[in-house]
Regions:
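Pre-Walker A (Motif I) flank of P-loop NTPase domains
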Residues: 1-4, 127
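Small-molecule kinase domains that catalyze NTP-dependent phosphoryl transfer to phosphate-bearing small molecules
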Residues: 59-66, 79-80, 169-214
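C-terminal helical "lid" subdomain and adjoining coupling/linker elements of P-loop NTPases
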Residues: 227-231
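Glycine-rich phosphate-binding P-loop
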Residues: 5-19
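Short, amphipathic alpha-helical "lid/cap" segments that border enzyme active or binding sites
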Residues: 117, 213-217, 221
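Conserved phosphate-donor/acceptor-positioning beta-strand/loop module used by diverse small-molecule
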Residues: 142-179
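Short beta-strand-centered segment that lines the nucleotide-binding/catalytic pocket of NTP-utilizing
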Residues: 28-39
Length: 231
């Protein structure tokens, strides 16, 4: 039951390598957008969900089911975060949103961390998952057998990649890379007092100016297989 966390600077390939590695390993892949989409799906009635055998659910449906269970447990425990709408808002928070210090934040730091930690730990405990970002390398750092991967690339290359991928001007891509790097670093310093690019937090560091995303995915999958044996 492999568990991989992917962390990386924007446009360094963490998302692409994570998805490709999940495909090679036959595991699920989850990132912020998939979590938000799953929370949005919680409006689907239980009757509709009950008509399906859980083994036939798509990963998105299973993720929604997991989040529904999380909300039910939170409500039973008197947790202040209740309802799919509140969860969707929380999961949609960016690094920049949570790194800011506000006197009266819409979502408190403690609620955010408690919720994200619980969700990511449950994903890790279930296994067969590649998780992108959200501090997953910190939350699952003590999970036996989990593989933590960092992707890096020179800023100039990341700007070039982002401009091409998003169809934006180089100046706009430059600002976005700068803002993303700053927010990602501030987020990890705020919640874990950690340098997000500290290589000691990771088992593998991939410098993607020197290798393709496909090779990076093969290296990640190979490392997982060497730890858990053939599937």
């Amino acid at each position: 039951m492999p568990v991989v966390t992917m962390s990386g600077t924007i446009a360094s390939g963490a998302r692409e390598i994570g998805r490709a590695a999940a495909s090679l390993l036959g595991t699920d892949y989850v990132d912020q957008q998939l979590l938000v989409d799953a929370a949005r799906r919680l409006g689907v009635s239980l009757d509709v969900m009950a008509k399906h055998d859980e083994r036939c659910f798509s990963f998105g449906e299973r993720l929604s089911s997991m989040l529904r269970g999380f909300l039910e447990r939170s409500a039973a425990g008197g947790d202040p975060l209740t309802g799919a709408g509140g969860l969707e808002v929380l999961l949609g928070r960016t690094y920049a949103d949570m790194a800011l210090e506000r006197e009266e934040p819409e979502i408190s730091d403690s609620v955010y961390m408690k919720t994200m930690t619980a969700i990511i730990r449950e994903l890790g405990d279930r296994g067969d998952i590649v998780v992108l970002g959200r501090g997953s390398q910190m939350i699952l750092r003590d999970l036996p057998g989990a593989l933590h991967v960092l992707t890096l690339a020179p800023q100039e290359l990341r700007i070039e990649r982002l401009a091409a991928r998003e169809g934006m001007l180089v100046e706009e891509a430059t600002q976005r890379v700068h803002n993303s790097d700053k927010a990602r670093g501030a987020f990890h310093r705020k919640f874990w007092k950690a340098d997000v690019n500290d290589s000691s937090l990771y088992d593998i560091t991939l410098e993607t100016s020197r290798l393709s995303y496909e090779v990076g995915a093969e290296l990640v999958a190979g490392a997982v297989r060497s730890n858990v044996g053939p599937g």
